[in-house]
UniProtKB/Swiss-Prot annotation:
Keywords: Cytoplasm, Methyltransferase, rRNA processing, S-adenosyl-L-methionine, Transferase. CDD domains: RlmH-like. It comes from Campylobacter lari (strain RM2100 / D67 / ATCC BAA-1060). Gene3D superfamilies: 3.40.1280.10. The gene is rlmH. Homodimer. Pfam families: SPOUT_MTase. Specifically methylates the pseudouridine at position 1915 (m3Psi1915) in 23S rRNA. This is Ribosomal RNA large subunit methyltransferase H. S-adenosyl-L-methionine binds at L73, G100, L119, S120, K121, M122, T123, L124. GO terms for molecular function: rRNA (pseudouridine-N3-)-methyltransferase activity.
């Protein structure tokens, strides 16, 4: 299985990065994992213009990476229990997760996904959402392989 994680963000080396690295190592025991952080001048300029331009810039930056079973993180997406999320990931050859920028995604981008998920009804800081997703991906593998991490 191949899992791709695309996010609109600058590469940072902070406390979240250390936790993300930990879960990435654990995930790689179960599958091939590729993470790409996308942030370019067009995104930076668009975010300083307005939300519509920002969302367009996210779509343009992420469109080339749509491969396999595509899942966008979106506040209006479906909420899953950990067990339901594990079932969603089963029997897929390639899964690509998309985490948008500060303004979320264009509706057209969401419509092109196989599904969209919400990690919570609350708004989460971008970095925390990514960390939470990584932990849930690892937990899903543990559930699907009866690993004792998930009890």
């Amino acid at each position: 299985m191949q899992i791709n994680l695309l996010s609109i963000q600058k590469n940072n080396n902070d406390e979240f990065s250390k936790i993300d690295e930990h879960y990435t190592k654990l995930i790689k025991k179960f599958c091939s994992f590729n993470e790409i952080c996308v942030f370019n001048n067009k995104i930076n300029q668009a975010q300083n213009t307005n939300s519509i331009e920002a969302k367009k810039s996210y779509t343009n930056a992420l469109n080339p990476y749509k491969k396999g079973f595509c899942i966008a993180l979106d506040e209006k997406g479906k909420e899953f229990t950990s067990v339901e999320f594990a079932k969603l990931l089963q029997d897929k050859n390639e899964i690509t997760f998309f985490i948008g920028g500060a303004y979320g995604f264009e509706q057209e981008f969401i419509a092109q996904m196989h599904t969209s998920i919400a990690l919570s009804k609350m708004t989460l800081v971008h970095k925390f959402a990514k960390t939470m997703l990584l932990e849930q991906i690892y937990r899903a593998f543990c559930i699907n392989t009866n690993h004792p991490y998930h009890k």
